[in-house]
Amino acid sequence: MSTNICSFKDRCVSILCCKFCKQVLSSRGMKAVLLADTEIDLFSTDIPPTNAVDFTGRCYFTKICKCKLKDIACLKCGNIVGYHVIVPCSSCLLSCNNRHFWMFHSQAVYDINRLDSTGVNVLLRGNLPEIEESTDEDVLNISAEECIR
């Protein structure tokens, strides 16, 4: 597997908001495609969203691969906004992937490009710290203007 093909460092980082209630769900989102069906657009994140989503329903498996999934719903409005890959299958782990296991449906969330510390340039994945210093409250208290923008 070539490093160039699987590099995600030049991808834009996004703030992900629920389309139903405008709740901020993640500040580390990235556009993604479903490995099992590249026609399906998604957003993903590497860190579990805290105080924004929770699991709902039972675990299930896809027809295309053997990943074990569980839906996630927005805590503010209750709508299903995506799913978590509870147990990735070996086929998906061996393919080119970004190691994000929190997935958001493009029909349920919208994205806002996140800016770097200068406030001018779009923040790129390669410049995003693995674990951010901000508290959960900092992430979730993004202004309504920022979410509506």
From Swiss-Prot:
Q: What induces it?
A: Up-regulated in gastric cancer.
Pfam families under this entry?
YPEH2ZP
* GO CC field: cytosol; intracellular membrane-bounded organelle
Instruction: Return the InterPro entries for the record.
Output: YPEH2ZP (IPR026768)
Family recorded in the similarity comment = Belongs to the FAM72 family.
Q: What is this protein called?
A: Protein FAM72D
From the broadest rank down, the organism's phylogenetic lineage runs: Eukaryota, Metazoa, Chordata, Craniata, Vertebrata
